[in-house]
């Protein structure tokens, strides 16, 4: 019995330590113009774990979809390309910035205003859930406001 209990406890500790910590650093967005139901989120997605993490689902309450997009030049036109799945290597950052990678939020039920904080829920292929906080900046913002 003691051996089984010790094994169970060790397995539980090992399992807890195996969960990767995925964070969004300096997450920010601009308040969208009136009548626009979408916005782009920027920042650095970081996997602090020892193994790769694949994000399979992103959600924001009151929005239809959240997806990773890349802005690319195609035949002289700037276009957004959907990237799926979102793979995060250990100890590396996925940098999201204007005119590059970004989380695209579409189908907003209402426009968030400057000063609000949005919460993105990210689910991995292993059903681990991470939450990311995103600060809403004025429409004229060029980057995140320091804390």
What is each PLM-predicted segment?
Residues 1-8:
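Bacterial N-terminal signal peptides that target proteins for export
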Residues 1, 19-22:
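Absolute protein N-terminus
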Residues 13-15, 19:
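N-terminal signal peptide c-region/cleavage motif recognized by signal peptidases
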Residues 21-147:
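Compact, glycine-rich, soluble single-domain proteins
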